[in-house]
Regions:
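Intrinsically disordered, low-complexity proline/glycine-rich segments
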Residues: 1-97
Length: 97
């Protein structure tokens, strides 16, 4: 089972999870859900805006939204040639189906 995604966990694109549940936590950090937002990031002169998390569990919900896990994706940052980030790091103690 994949680890639960939380605020401050990193995505493969360089973003971090920025928003999460106001009342459900793992390891002292709010858990992330589908439609929560990532941070923006830049590399050199390139800048990528914040995007929403677009995947989550089909059977675990936090505040009526699918729970985000390691491997779940965020929206594409720009055009079809741009990268898509996936949650890379999650809770070491909470795992979600």
């Amino acid at each position: 089972m994949p680890a639960a995604g939380r605020i401050s966990d990193r995505l493969s694109c360089g973003d971090f999870i920025k928003t999460g549940s106001a009342d459900v936590y793992a390891d002292g950090l709010p858990l992330a859900r589908e439609n929560d937002i990532t941070t923006s990031h830049s590399i050199g002169r390139d800048f990528w805006r914040s995007v929403k998390l677009v995947e989550g569990s089909s059977n675990v919900f936090i505040n009526n939204r699918p729970a985000t896990r390691v491997g779940d994706a965020a929206e594409q940052h720009c055009s079809s040639s741009c990268h898509v980030g996936k949650v890379q790091k999650g809770s070491p103690t909470v795992f979600i189906n």
